[in-house]
């Protein structure tokens, strides 16, 4: 595919501002994408600043390499942000990072390129992998999973209330021929959905669940949050933008847990006074959402929510 798919970075100014960038600071962009946040952050850094970008997507890596060639302060790594702890340790940066940004979910170029297989609106190969060279594709999962496994993925990760009906329809149809195209799967799911939601494609939730499963998105998020906390220096900022309730719930619980501290889980009269049990994060402000102006310019920002925390110890 030679087509260029435009990506509008969500909460661009808000996210960069939340990082409170210092000119000589060291920062991590865990989800480089097409580099919107990274470019804006580099504008805030001085000659001594450093920015390390992560992405699994080969197309994002191409964009990142071009940026690295332009700007020696930037380095791109083809890894999931779930593995940022390993990369940070290898570079001797653990506990020295001033800010970590995670902009979760799928980028517009991934959604809009039919060949990537993420979209039910544009027909393409049923793939859905962020890195097409790793793991099993959506087509392979649909071909080999049991009816119960398919239903669980739709229910748990897509929050689809008709998951069982959809899974049953998929298993019945695949006995005739395998699913290889997104439009084919979307059609079967749509027919199996008895109650369409106004303004929402009937296949939306099922496709979300399938994508999250194929890419282990929630597992990666949990690992990435833990790694980000260990990577940060005291006073460093963690900024996370999520796009659906499952992601946001994980981020919210993680930040709240570390803002309360382990002592909150111990009996009140227990004679223990140790820094080990003190809070590790401080929540900064309330969750932020896209402005009316941004919503008009980029409707995909409507579900975005940004949470910010600062490392205390």
UniProtKB/Swiss-Prot annotation:
Pfam families: Methyltransf_5. GO terms for molecular function: rRNA (cytosine-N4-)-methyltransferase activity. It is found in: Cytoplasm. The gene is rsmH. GO terms for cellular component: cytoplasm. It catalyses: cytidine(1402) in 16S rRNA + S-adenosyl-L-methionine = N(4)-methylcytidine(1402) in 16S rRNA + S-adenosyl-L-homocysteine + H(+). Specifically methylates the N4 position of cytidine in position 1402 (C1402) of 16S rRNA. The keyword Glycosyltransferase does not apply. This is Ribosomal RNA small subunit methyltransferase H.
């Amino acid at each position: 595919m030679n087509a260029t798919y435009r990506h509008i970075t969500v909460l661009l100014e808000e996210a960069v501002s939340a990082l409170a960038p210092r000119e000589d600071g060291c920062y991590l962009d865990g989800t480089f994408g097409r580099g919107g946040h990274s470019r804006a952050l580099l504008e805030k850094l001085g000659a001594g600043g450093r920015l390390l970008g992560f992405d699994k997507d080969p197309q994002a890596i191409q964009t990142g390499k071009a940026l690295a060639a332009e700007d020696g302060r930037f380095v791109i790594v083809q890894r999931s942000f779930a593995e940022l702890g390993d990369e940070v340790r290898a570079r001797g940066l653990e506990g020295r990072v001033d800010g970590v940004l995670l902009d979760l979910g799928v980028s517009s170029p991934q959604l809009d390129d039919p060949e990537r297989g993420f979209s039910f609106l544009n027909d393409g190969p049923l793939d859905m992998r962020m890195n097409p060279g790793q793991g099993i594709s959506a087509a392979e999962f649909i071909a080999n999973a049991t009816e119960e496994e398919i239903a669980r993925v739709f229910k748990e990760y897509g929050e689809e209330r008709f998951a069982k009906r959809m899974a049953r329809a998929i298993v019945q149809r695949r006995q005739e021929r395998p699913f290889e195209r997104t439009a084919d799967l979307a059609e079967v799911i749509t027919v199996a959905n008895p109650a369409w939601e106004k303004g929402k494609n009937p296949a939306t939730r099922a496709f979300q669940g399938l994508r999250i499963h194929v890419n282990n998105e929630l597992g990666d998020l949990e690992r990435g949050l833990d790694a980000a906390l260990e990577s940060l220096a005291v006073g460093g900022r963690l900024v996370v933008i999520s796009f659906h309730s499952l992601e946001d719930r994980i981020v919210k619980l993680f930040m709240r847990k570390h803002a309360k501290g382990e002592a909150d889980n111990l009996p009140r009269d227990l004679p223990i006074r140790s820094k080990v049990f003190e809070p590790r994060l401080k929540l900064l402000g309330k969750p932020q959402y896209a402005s009316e102006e941004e919503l008009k310019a980029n409707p995909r920002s409507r579900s975005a929510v940004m949470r910010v925390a600062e490392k205390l110890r």
